[in-house]
Amino acid sequence: MIDTDDSRGAPVKIAALPNRPQPMTPDALITLQQHLFYALNSAPNETRRLFHGRGRCWPGLEQLTVDWLQGVLLVALFKPVSDTELAALQQMLLDLGHSAAWQDSGAHSLLLQLRYLPESPTQWLLGEPVEHWDICEHGLHYRLDLGKKQNSGLFLDMRYGRQWVQAQAAGKRVLNLFAYTCGFSVAALAGGAHQVVNLDMARAALSRGRDNHRLNQHDLSQVVFLGHDLFKSWGKVAKYGPYDLIIIDPPSFQRGSFVLSKDYPKVLRRLPELLSENGTVLACSNEPEIGPDYLIQAMAAEAPSLHFSERLDNPPEFPDSQPDSALKALVFQRH
């Protein structure tokens, strides 16, 4: 077993993968630079991941991601590199920031986040530091925290999941467990949900969720925010049910509150008493060691009235040489 982290940066222990990260060589940096030049030449109108090295498709760049935040380029490095490699990466990024492709894209700020260090410090290589930044995805607006926290506030790999929820939500009561900053809730309200109940222990994250709803001019009387430990709050959750759609998107590991392999079955076990007669569940996992079969088998054991329907695709900007190690977003239907 080795210490690593899931595709969003949460610490987990997994079996050693066969293709170990390679040194970040000059050739690897040239590959990254060329990729970013091409991406900036056709910069998207909305927030997107521009480079997903963590999918292990580019040797030497396995621990690096680059996100386009509509004028802000956020580069995240998840594992230590040598001082020489870090300096070379910084210089390459500075060169990129003074290129014609950079100017033509409308970019103005460039951040390098060192996710492997305590508190994930961020270096502002270009542009004036800003604490909050508003972005757009699929026509919806979200507020991000830049340079202050490990995660900025929206997991871009779940883009298709949010779109799916928006398409499914009309007229439904929705339960959003492990809600974080309520991205699913925003999508559900935009899709015409009757009510959304968000639960997360992190009240600061839920507060940002309120901000996200306000950015989209949503009626907050349709949204409930529960800042509680789920395993001590089943009664509060049930009070607002039954639910037509339940979303479960937990961290792989949260010290003192959630261990996916141990606690996920406890959540699944409660679904039959929370779900409406023909309700739907979107069950998600980012832990590399746990493939989709784990969730399918766990659901069959803990909530046999729910049947696997489909696995949502991951966005194409998140290629992965081992798809079962990437994000799993599985749909289950009650019959």
Q: Which role does the model predict for each range below?
A:
Residues Q195-D200:
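Conserved SAM-binding motif I beta-strand of class I
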Residues G171-F178:
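Conserved class I S-adenosyl-L-methionine
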Residues T280-H335:
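C-terminal catalytic and target-recognition region of SAM-dependent MTase-like enzymes
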Residues A204-G241, L245:
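S-adenosyl-L-methionine
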Residues P59-G60, T65-D67, A88-F155, Q163:
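Non-catalytic substrate-recognition/targeting regions of SAM-dependent transferases
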Residues Y264-E277:
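A short glycine-rich, Lys/Arg-flanked "PGG" loop and its adjoining helix->strand segment in the class I
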Residues M1-Q70:
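Non-catalytic accessory regions of SAM-dependent methyltransferases
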Residues T181-G192:
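Conserved SAM-binding loop of SAM-dependent methyltransferases across substrates and taxa
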